[in-house]
Amino acid sequence: SHVYGPQKGLGAKDIPLAEAALRRLAMVWSKQNSSASKLPGSGAAGGLGFGLHCFAGAKIESGFELFSGMAKLPQLIRRHDLVITGEGTLDRQTVMGKGVGELAKMAKNCDCDCYALAGKIENEKMLSPYFNECAALVDLTPSRKAEANAAIWLERSAGNLAKQCAI
């Protein structure tokens, strides 16, 4: 609730209520069955992983690992000089299992540079071990203007990022 709740529209006063409700559900379920709430990924997608595991018998696994394995992503990355990726917001959640953060880590492990485009960036210093450079649309124009004309501002931001790559 504390990590993803605000991103999904949960107000500050509602976070403790949601957290308490989810903890209660996890406690009730663990008394009946297992400690699924402790499984990595059980809190992802608003607790969808937990619910599907408990009530439908689904196996929780990393979506990034699944798809990167299917696409043979490490082999593809090793054949290139750089990776360019993007996300609406780059922040501390980016490196907590989100696909774009996992891609950046994989690129670094493959000795490949990784660049990112985003709508906005929070705490760029924390992201610097994973990305060679990041560019945000809101650095060029106010957030509302960027949202209203995202394609234009994304193109300009990508152009600026390309100049950084060429240096």
Show which residues each predicted segment covers.
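N-terminal loops that bind phosphate or other acidic moieties
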Residues: 1-167
